[in-house]
Amino acid sequence: MVSDNEMGLVLAVSSSVFIGSSFILKKKGLKRAAANGTRAGFGGYTYLLEPLWWVGLVTMTFGEIANFVAYVYAPAVLVTPLGALSIIISAVLAHFLLDEKLRKMGVWGCVCCIVGSVMIVIHAPQEQTPNSVEEIWKLAMQPAFLIYVAISMSIVLALILYCEPLCGQTNILVYIGICSLMGSLTVMSIKAVGIAIKLTFEGINQIWYPETWFFAMVAAICVVMQMIYLNKALDTFNAAIVSPIYYVMFTTLTIVASAIMFKDWNGQNTDSIASEICGFITVLTGTVILHSTREEEQASPRRMRWQDSGKSFDEEHLTSLYSPEY
């Protein structure tokens, strides 16, 4: 019989495959659409008529659903770091299908992500799934988790009310800090809702419990806040910088929140916990390396010829332009 951890592992890996592939499908769809109309980056919507873009969107939807269900079966310490595999999938597929070459350092980044993921999978704790949403509520009402929530919300409020007006446009940690803290609470709430849905399908109805709807409301609020400030970060700063920092902060805070609320590491020996932490650090290192190679590619100048309209063709100027695309 398949264990919950094995089911969560399969779903998490499937999610990464779907999401990583969806980026390539959507990008190819955008390129086709750009050849027939205005690019999306310049306000065009011709991609909505491109079937390949829709295939990518559906693929991403399947990936997000698989990721959601994975949290129901496995602890966050197993599921969350495996999200880095989607970066590997997209990088490898982009190398072969989009002619976006994967450099040697990028290959090392992929290797680090794979090695770290294997370490986490081997030493991941076996989670004890609660038998009712009321049990999850008791876990959420533990003093340690309430302190985590209080500290997180205090930091979020301080960042929004004080730091954002002062340095939101210059300090990348303001926006990313907000969406990472809210993201950790999103995962905890979504996991609670997912377990309630799973128990309901198994015949133990959890829909009419007020705790279920409270967790659903918290999840909705946190998701909206998370998306608002992630979009602000992407709009203000380079995506090649935002992505690795956000991944590191979001993953770290999610694992901390899950360890406090669900006691993921209870019953594990020190060696297993140390191995998981080492695996996690290895995945983070690989992710940063992968994104740094992309940032280098972005910074490589493209030489372009242009003609001054007031001068002859022989008086052509050369200028180096940096590509705005990520």
Curated annotation (Swiss-Prot):
Q: Which domain of life is it from?
A: Eukaryota
The answer on whether this UniProt entry bears the keyword Ribosomal protein reads: no
Q: Which GO terms describe its cellular component?
A: early endosome; plasma membrane
Arranged from A to Z, the UniProt key words for this protein are: Cell membrane, Endosome, Ion transport, Magnesium, Membrane, Transmembrane, Transmembrane helix, Transport
Job description of the protein:
Acts as a Mg(2+) transporter. Can also transport other divalent cations such as Fe(2+), Sr(2+), Ba(2+), Mn(2+) and Co(2+) but to a much less extent than Mg(2+).
The similarity annotation says: Belongs to the NIPA (TC 2.A.7) family.
Please identify the protein, giving its name as recorded: Probable magnesium transporter NIPA7
Q: Which organism is it from?
A: Arabidopsis thaliana (Mouse-ear cress)
